[in-house]
Amino acid sequence: MSFSDLARQTQFIDGVGQADLVASGKVSALELLDAAIERTTELNPPINAINITWFEHAREIAKKFKSNSKQKFGGVPFILKDLGAPYAGQHMSNGNIALKNAKYIAPVNSLLVQRFIDAGLIIFGRSNSPEFGSVPVTEPLAWGPTRNPWDLSKSSGGSSGGSAAAVAAGIVPMAHASDGGGSIRIPAACCGLIGLKTSQGRISLAPFGDEANFSVHFAVTRTVRDAAALLDEVHGPGVGDRVIAPTPTRPFKSEVGADPGKLRIGFIDHHLAGEKIDNECVQAVRDTCKLLESLGHSVENSWPSALDDKQASGKFTAMWSTNMSVGINALSLMLGRETTKDDVELMNWTMAEYAKSKTATDYAQAVYASMIYRRTMQQWWADGFDLLVTPTTAQLPLPIGTICNMPDDPLAALRIAGNWIPLTPPFNTSGQPAINVPLQWTKEGIPVGIQIVAAYGREDLLIRVASQLETAQPWAHRTPNL
């Protein structure tokens, strides 16, 4: 594979490092962008991470770019997930075939996208996403599957699988991602990245999203310092936000390298529903716990009692299905016509149809159940624990096609997904911050994700501990051979 010197030299430099190159005058924003475009052209075809590009639009922005001290990521190339991140004047499909064919153009920037721009990021495209982000793999009928850079026969995870694959391949140093049930942490686990799901209300979802829902938006990164520095640039409420996370006491970047002190940490290394969990995932948790103990922390075989509730996911079905129904109604507005069954993938259409059997009372009861679950979950931290360590996924990255539309059983994909990722959705319901840390790898060189969960509002503690682990057992030298 023939790269220019700059494209090769900057391939695995993180966002902070690339911004430093621009600020120092060693490279221009346009040169850095062209290097990323070159890598996109060479590396994207086998992995299908980036599905929409606007290279010339980005080049015009890069040509006019003038670095200043307020833009912490000035001139750094960046991509948006093709889901729920409107960028004024640019195409967005949400992984949906009808929006793709209609060439839907976003009318405004979301507040987060505007904050990315204000931070100096040069946005040149979108990353692949499953339709409406409804499954933890990235294989939409509209755009085809995104493949894992570490093993092209495997999934990159989802729903932010395109972003994770692009960062893992070194196309960009970090990329926008979102998480409604694990969709930042799961692809980060599959692709060997940092994936920080922030606290509910940490980052505004204005003007269209609802912070009181399960989903959050942020990014996947290669390094802890990128996650911390980017969070400094984009966190905070917007006008009218219903949920606002506690204000940090100092910049998140200050937590990188800070001593976390001696922490009380619980762990879980089995599947709560009694399903299969890969030996590599179990061993990854145990090895991580040993590492944490060697760093001076107290580790106990303990976890929140809420995780033992095997009926929990069923209690929230009315919410999930109703949210899908609302999403399909929104699709009609975006298309300017009524949505038909042919416009939507079968699983999502079936879920929305299921919502019609639910009443307002069913929905209200699900909201109430989620509130009780949230309080029960958070009580474990209130009782004296600082962190929880779990496998991010119960199995290694799945083969492409494992989770797909099945005409004879449209909702089978959700059951398969639930068995694969039992320990990420609970912390969307509880609203707590959680991070995937790429500490462990199989003998074959496949990443094995570790999830660390903190109390609500404690991203600072996650950053301290993740930074401590990154120093103790570095992963930056690990890169896929594409």
Where are the regions a protein language model picked out?
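A short acidic, glycine-rich active-site loop
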Residues: 98-106, 151-154, 409-421
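An N-terminal boundary/leader segment
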Residues: 1-63, 294-296, 356, 478-482
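Short glycine/serine-rich loop segments
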Residues: 106-238, 428-449
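Short, surface-exposed loop/helix-turn segments at secondary-structure junctions
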Residues: 244, 314, 365, 384, ...
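A short helix-breaking turn/cap at a secondary-structure junction
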Residues: 1, 194-289, 472-482
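Acidic/His- and Gly-rich active-site-bordering loop/insert found
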Residues: 58-60, 68-141
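Short helix-loop capping/hinge segments that flank enzyme active sites or metal/cofactor-binding pockets
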Residues: 3-7, 73-98, 257-269, 318-378, ...
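Acyltransferase
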Residues: 26-34, 110, 251-254, 277-304, ...
